[in-house]
């Protein structure tokens, strides 16, 4: 649960936060630093506490214990309207009777900003989200993506130190969501404002974030860059939650050198990279992403290195061919190969006998643990 160790200055510090609802603890002793100008995503399954963290930062909920510090000021007891943060909700929460301009100007008017200053600031914010020509329209005259942008313009117009986004893209269709992911990231870079984004969508988190926090049961399971989270999961929960992954049972046979061991993986002997302190007989988990696995067809009882299995399912997805391989042990393995129509070995036949292999050192090795 340690905050990221970076030289950047934190704009938000959460120290020992606890929060319970109806006697059930949702957040347990949470510590987190969020750096100035960072795009941080809090990722986790429903009920993990991610939205509660956002609400504690915004001031919509009060913590039972701990501190919320924003820009070096303890705001734990400060009401939401006096914190330098704005929130974009999943529902957008636009005022239906107001025009786009009036929606964006609302917060400035509440702050008693002079009318001469309001118009240029609102139009600047609308230009930033490419909606300046829509200023006279009402929300019902806009598409879902345009309403989303109005909500963002309204949130950034009064220049908050931090922008909080709670599942803000989940109501959009797939194509629009992908477009908004790109636009949000570009907007964040342009503004230099710290964004804290809450989602359960792993792909969204990987594509948008500078840093990801993976949560479970009110605790931080892993804190790292998107690449670290995907390629170097610290436990089975993170590995299974982020994308697809194959988990093989392995038993240590002997250590070969500081970095490699010989192990029995699903009944076949293989060299694997493992820097854990292990001894002969120890149980391990060997993790491989579907795209890291290679298949070699076995014909005419020829000898092949690898774990033996049979092609049970094939799904053509344009760029990739996804296969399900049933190993001799009964385990199912997911494989994703780039589809090359000129390669006769890629388009495997159903029930084809294959050897499952991978490039040495691409595997992630974890100590055996209870299934997450």
Curated annotation (Swiss-Prot):
The keyword Nucleotide-binding applies. It is a peripheral membrane protein. It comes from the Bacteria. Residues 12-242 form the ABC transporter domain. Keywords: ATP-binding, Cell inner membrane, Cell membrane, Membrane, Nucleotide-binding, Translocase, Transport. SMART domains: AAA (SM00382). It is an enzyme of class 7 (translocase). ATP binds at residues 44-51. InterPro entries: AAA+_ATPase, ABC_SmlMolc_Importer, ABC_transporter-like_ATP-bd, ABC_transporter-like_CS, Mo/tungstate-bd_C_term_dom, P-loop_NTPase, PotA-like, PotA_ATP-bd. The complex is composed of two ATP-binding proteins (PotA), two transmembrane proteins (PotB and PotC) and a solute-binding protein (PotD). This is Spermidine/putrescine import ATP-binding protein PotA. The gene is potA.
């Amino acid at each position: 649960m340690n905050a990221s160790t970076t030289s950047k200055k934190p704009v938000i510090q959460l120290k020992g936060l606890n929060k319970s609802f109806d006697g059930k603890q949702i957040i347990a002793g949470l510590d987190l630093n969020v750096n100035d100008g960072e795009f941080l995503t809090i990722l986790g399954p429903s009920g993990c506490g991610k939205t509660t963290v956002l609400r504690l930062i915004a001031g919509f909920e009060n913590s039972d214990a701990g501190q919320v510090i924003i820009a070096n000021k303890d705001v734990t007891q400060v009401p939401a309207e006096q914190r330098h943060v704005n929130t974009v909700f999943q529902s957008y929460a636009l005022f239906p009777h107001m025009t786009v301009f009036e929606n964006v100007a609302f917060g400035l008017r509440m702050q008693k900003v002079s009318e001469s200053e309001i118009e240029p600031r609102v139009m600047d914010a609308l230009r930033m989200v490419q909606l300046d020509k829509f200023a006279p329209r009402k929300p019902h005259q806009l598409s879902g993506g345009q309403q989303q942008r109005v909500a963002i313009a309204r949130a950034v117009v009064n220049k908050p130190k931090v922008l909080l986004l709670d599942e803000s893209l989940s109501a959009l269709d797939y194509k629009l969501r992908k477009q908004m992911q790109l636009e949000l990231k570009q907007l964040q870079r342009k503004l230099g404002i710290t964004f804290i984004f809450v989602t359960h969508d792993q792909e969204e988190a990987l594509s948008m974030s500078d840093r990801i926090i993976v949560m479970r049961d009110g605790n931080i399971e892993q804190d790292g860059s998107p690449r670290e989270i995907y390629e170097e999961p610290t436990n089975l929960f993170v590995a299974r939650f982020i994308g697809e992954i194959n988990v093989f049972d392995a038993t240590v046979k002997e250590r070969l050198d500081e970095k490699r061991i010989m192990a029995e993986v699903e009944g076949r002997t293989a060299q694997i990279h493992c820097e854990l302190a292990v001894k002969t007989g120890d149980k391990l988990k060997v993790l491989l992403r579907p795209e890291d696995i290679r298949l070699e067809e076995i014909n005419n009882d020829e000898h092949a290195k690898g774990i033996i299995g049979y092609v049970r399912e094939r799904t053509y997805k344009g760029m990739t061919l996804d296969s399900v391989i049933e190993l001799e042990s009964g385990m199912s393995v997911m494989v994703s190969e780039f589809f090359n129509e000129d390669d006769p070995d890629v388009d495997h036949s159903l029930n084809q006998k294959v050897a499952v292999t991978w490039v040495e050192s691409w595997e992630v090795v974890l100590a055996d643990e209870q299934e997450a």
